Amino acid sequence: MILLSQAYELKLAPHPAPFSVLKYRGFDDVSRLYRYEVEFTSPVAGIPMDQVLGRPAKFIIDPVDPNLDYLRKMFGENAEKFSDKPPARTIHGIITQFDEYGTSADETRYKVVLEPKLADLDRGVTSRLFQKQSVEEIVTGTLRHYGYQSGVDFQFQLRAKYRRYEYITQYHESTFAFIQRICAQEGIWFRFEQKRDRAVIIFGDDLDAYARNQRTVPLRRDAGLESAGAEAIRSLERQTLRVPEAVRLHDYNHRQADVSLLVEESAARDDKTTHAVDYHWGEHYETPEEGRRIARLRHEAHLARQITYSGKGNAFSLEAGEVMRLDQNPADAPHGLFITSVESGGGRSEAYWNTFTAIPADRVWRPSVDLAKRPVIDGILPARITSPGDYKYAYLTEQGWYVIKLPFDLDEWSPGGTSRPVRLARPYGGDNYGHHFPFIDGTEVAIIHTHGDPDRPVIMGAMHDSLHPDLVNNLNNTRNIIRTAGGTEWRVEDKQGVEHSHLTTPYQTSELNLGHMVDADRRERGQGAELRTDGHLSARAAKGMLISAEAQPGGSGEQLAMPNADATLQQAEAILRSLNDSASAAQAWLAEVDQQRALVEQKLAKLQKPVIVASAPEGIGVASGQHMQLAAARQMFVTAGEGLDIGVLKRITIAAGDAISVFAAKVGIRILAAKGKVQIQAQGDAMELMSLKDMVVSSSDGEVVITARKGVTLGDGAGAYLKIANGKIEIASPSEVQVKGGLDVDGPAKGNFTFPGWSGSPLKDAKGNMNFGFSE
């Protein structure tokens, strides 16, 4: 076919003025926007910008058949049916640039740039979030958002199945650059097909998405023999590169921290021309299977550039993304060439021409992924914690992650769905232990990103702002405070002279205060230590507890040091042992000194057993507004170095299951009753009243009655006695009997006496504690 000349036409809707195309140059690449620079002249000068810029346009290249005049003579109106010229090519788009060069008397020279409508998505940068979508779904949703119709304005011809990403971020990049980037990362490329009324975007990922126009172009290297206008490839050059033999990837997925993500893949294992392993960290995949898929895509991208061709010619209507067959296909491309880029040109004084780059058509084209060109978020980005419905407490996942609202995200999301769950970096952590103060809705947080990747945010910490002021400022700059949203607080004051630690919770106002104590207005309310609550308080120590008022200056000394208590307990043991010796001599019942010694030496000393030792050098006071109970399951010891005073306003009861022994070694025993009877009874045995010296039995306002059912005997140390028994009186004396005073002897008479009686049943053994009870 002979193509000596072409007709060029530029059409706008509406058309502002007559145009005559002077020349053009076009650029078309796979996965890029095509660009046609068209220069033209017009008899109209000063065409307004708004009549051209941004308007839909068509650039038409229509070959001229040099034999058309002859065919018209032969066939008339049917001449074009017998012409060999290919159909005209129409490039659709919009005008993105409009220049005016100069004006002469006859015409004005202009230049426009025609690009696809998709170029409008490359004008300004924006930032958006996409969640739980595949790349195909993201691209489809984005293009539809801007008015593109699926199946009409764009089509997907994909073979692979693509996973849904939890989170993909468009950050400070144009929408076109974002689409271009995420497609490249998945190994998806795109091309344009010029239809009758529009340019259609075709997304593909394999050989079957290549455009196949079923034509064969002659390869005619310039030899001066062929006709100068014949459609052909005039030159074809091959370039080969030594590429990596494999791609190795590695990453880390904190959701499966024990799973290794180190993978390596090769798409050409038997190729001896390859060498080295291309290793990258941080492609952001979650499983080894996904990693191997990405590694294979990256190696296929290397292999797609292993063999490349560059050519020149005038093959008409050559497009990036199509397969071109040659009548002499190269040995490395037996199935033809896949065109990756085309540059073309022509005009009034220049025949149509083009240059191209290509790869063998049996190789899968993969866009190159330049990691350095990915958007990067450097430094700290502010964000806010979000939750569904202003959740009162921290809204967390099972793993303890948060949902955040990023400042650049202008989309409306369902409550609590503004981001994927984001991890919180903490100063300390481990297997179910660590440091975590939960954030609630509205908290400002500082966000950083792993490797600067916008898809991998991490919460670094919380920030205060005008809505959430800091709890430490110039007014309390000596205080260190940890306070929760619920009001639980730990405050440490560093101001010299009033240092303190204050731990409190609002519930029942439970507090621990150490050091200098102040109220809410910083007025002093005490010093030392205080543990208080409006509720219950318990103190437990499984190995023993020491409660002591003994001084340890400067906090020095052993934890269980209690020298004063030890001395007092040892003194008590010595006192009781000494009193026992005296009691033994007096034939009184003895105290259980051995048990006391065992208690002191084997249990109380150094808290060898679970005991409580309470010690105070100057005294201990125990007070109760109502009742008090002291109980011991076995033995109770009460010892004092000087005296024991027990005062009860109403009454005292002392009861013993076995016996009571009261012994006074020196001064004596007094039992007095200011009012009421004094009763002493031996209800089950004899009673002995003995004294070393005089014994007085008297009644100041009554009589003394001495009775005994079996008799009464009064005797002295010399042998004289008076015996009353069995209804008779017997008087005896080893010497004389003196009777002073009158003596009346009458007939017999009888007295009537009442004798007490007691139950003969024995007392039951008391099971449990023996108590001293003190009551009102």
Q: Where does each model-flagged region fall?
A:
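Amphipathic alpha-helical and helix-coil boundary elements used as assembly
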Residues: 1-776
